[in-house]
Amino acid sequence: MGKITFYEDRSFQGRHYECSTDHSNLQPYFSRCNSVRVDSGCWMLYEQPNFAGCQYFLRRGDYPDYQQWMGFSDSVRSCHLIPHSTSHRIRIYEREDYRGQMVEITDDCSHLQDRFHFSDFHSFHVMEGYWVLYEMPNYRGRQYLLRPGEYRRYHDWGAMNARVGSLRRIMDFY
């Protein structure tokens, strides 16, 4: 079971809302979110209702302002508690629809292009575990949650292009 608390003001001040499950619409509970405390679990926050818009991965810890979770604004409108998984396996492909070169990964990779020499990554097949995909190397830039399943093209994981710089397993205990 996870637990996350959203605060309207920075440094855990102002009106707050405690949550322990997925929420598709947080708007009734607070108008803005400037700080977050994650007591347990791993969470994906979304700027828009219904798990849409920019995504932000948070694990246990304190985030006194939205820049701490690489947020672009104080807008958090939905959240998803990420299930715990013990094993991780993902296949990445050079082209859409699982074409081109394929590489299977079971660990984090801070710089995909250096490691595999592809210029773009157009499709993914998540066999086991949950992953966070980052737009830039060293776990920076826009973030995307990858759940077990198939992602035939970058639109399937919510991206505007096939630029992928790094990939990290979600491995936090409750």
UniProtKB/Swiss-Prot annotation:
Presence of keyword Cytoplasm: no
Keywords linked to the UniProt accession: Eye lens protein, Repeat
SUPFAM superfamilies: gamma-Crystallin-like
Domain Beta/gamma crystallin 'Greek key': 2-40, 41-83, 88-128, 129-171
Annotated region described as Connecting peptide, given as residue ranges: 84-87
GO MF annotation, one: structural constituent of eye lens
Superkingdom per UniProt: Eukaryota
Pfam short name (any one): Crystall
SMART domains: XTALbg (SM00247)
Gene Ontology BP terms: eye development
InterPro entries documented for this protein: Beta/Gamma-Crystallin, Beta/gamma_crystallin, G_crystallin-like
Domain notes from UniProt: Has a two-domain beta-structure, folded into four very similar Greek key motifs.
Protein role: Crystallins are the dominant structural components of the vertebrate eye lens.
Family, per entry: Belongs to the beta/gamma-crystallin family.
Any further remark recorded for this protein: There are six different gamma crystallins identified in mouse lens.
Name assigned to this protein: Gamma-crystallin F
Organism encoding this protein: Mus musculus
